[in-house]
Amino acid sequence: MKEFDTIAAIATALGEGGIAIIRVSGNKALEIVNKIFRGINGKDLLDIKPYTMRYGHMIDENNEIIDEVIVSFMKGPRSFTAEDTVEINCHGGIVATNKVLQNVIKAGARLAEPGEFTKRAFLNGRIDLSQAEAVMDIITAKTELSMKSAMTQSQGRLSTEINNLRKEALDILALIEYAVDFTEDDEEPDETIPVKVKEDVITLRGKVNNLIDTADEGKLIRDGLSMVIVGKPNVGKSSLLNALLNENRAIVTDIAGTTRDVIEEYINLDGIPVRLVDTAGIRETEDVVEKIGVEKSKEKINEADLVILMLDTSRELDEEDKEIIDYIKDRKYIVLLNKVDLDRKLSSEIVDNLENKIELSAKTGFGIDDLKSKIKDLFFNGSIDAESVMVTNTRHKEALYRASENLDGALNGLNNNEFLDLVSIYVTSALRALGEITGAELEEDLVNKIFAEFCCGK
């Protein structure tokens, strides 16, 4: 375990609440907190047993009571950071919590940097980097499904998979080294070794690519699906948004162009976090405010994972509808034929040629379940398993791509009968790329950058 100074930070969300927790970690954690703790009957903290709690008060330099607290003690390495850790349970609230923290710092602790507690857990070998990143994913999870996926990663399932792949890469390198040593000793080379190396590289590349194939689904589970609702004004976009949200979030009127700006909301679609974007229409307009909304709509369409095109079945297709269809036709889309509860007037060969059509009444809710099923079919083949090993982090995906590309390079070298020691350069690069995922191979600056994105107190 590495030697660090003692750090402290508020571990709970800042604001009014029943209880707040101040976390203190480091070799002097107990000694520092003891300086400002007064237990019942004069008891201090120096004789506290690990994994127990003690009731008392926090006091300032004038021996005045700051707050009533319960203090717990976790002895390293059996703690989150693998260091001695003290947690002060005090009353919630900005003033009370900050007052306790200020006195902990006065007593000798340093204010922790964002993510520094988790960083210490990583540097002390308690967790690897992918597990550390999963901690933040647990905190930011928007649905139970994304929570389960993050929990699976935090328990080391992905780490185990990556470590197994690294072992296979090391075995390939050992085989290459064995063959190269034979050549250097002027012994007759074993002609079966290049064949075995090639087979192993192909197998390893296949496993790496299988993980890459999970990345798109994994990213959607972690970050959510970006879905844009688009259509001409008053086609029912806001009504659809409200139907999906089960509340009147958007203004619904008979006046075209009422939604003048982009409206964004999150919904839980059977465990998938979906960021719904209700846009202004994209018609030509002279209204300056509406024109800004139209430009924002086009930006959101270009950024979206899925476009929901709404058409009004109670009206004929017009030029504005055709303009929208032309704009979104090369993207992944679903066509909602809205207002089927009214007399149908929509009839067009253009519409007939569109894919993924669903009849809907946003007003009555008819067709909403069909829409949800279609979304799952398009992105998850109809089923989702958050407990299987999958790649949810873009950094991990990029590292896997580099590993796969280097294994491609190794395979090309083998096919061209290049020297095995040249092939080993590609395999070594693949090994390092895989190591970046768990932190086994990573520059210190990048490690610092990753943990800097964490919240304080974690």
UniProtKB/Swiss-Prot annotation:
Keywords: Cytoplasm, GTP-binding, Hydrolase, Magnesium, Metal-binding, Nucleotide-binding, Potassium, tRNA processing. Mg(2+) binds at residues 238, 259. Its main location: cytoplasm. The keyword GTP-binding applies. SUPFAM superfamilies: P-loop containing nucleoside triphosphate hydrolases. It is found in: Cytoplasm. GO terms for cellular component: cytosol. K(+) binds at residues 234, 253, 255, 258. Its EC number is 3.6.-.-. Residues 224-380 form the TrmE-type G domain. (6S)-5-formyl-5,6,7,8-tetrahydrofolate binds at residues 23, 87, 126, 458. Its cofactor is K(+). Pfam families: MMR_HSR1, MnmE_helical, TrmE_N. Binds 1 potassium ion per subunit. Coiled coil: none annotated. GTP binds at residues 234-239, 253-259, 278-281. InterPro entries: G_TrmE, GTP-bd, GTP-bd_TrmE_N, GTPase_MnmE, MnmE_dom2, MnmE_helical, P-loop_NTPase, Small_GTP-bd. Belongs to the TRAFAC class TrmE-Era-EngA-EngB-Septin-like GTPase superfamily. TrmE GTPase family. HAMAP family: GTPase_MnmE. Homodimer. Heterotetramer of two MnmE and two MnmG subunits. Exhibits a very high intrinsic GTPase hydrolysis rate. Involved in the addition of a carboxymethylaminomethyl (cmnm) group at the wobble position (U34) of certain tRNAs, forming tRNA-cmnm(5)s(2)U34. This is tRNA modification GTPase MnmE. The gene is mnmE.
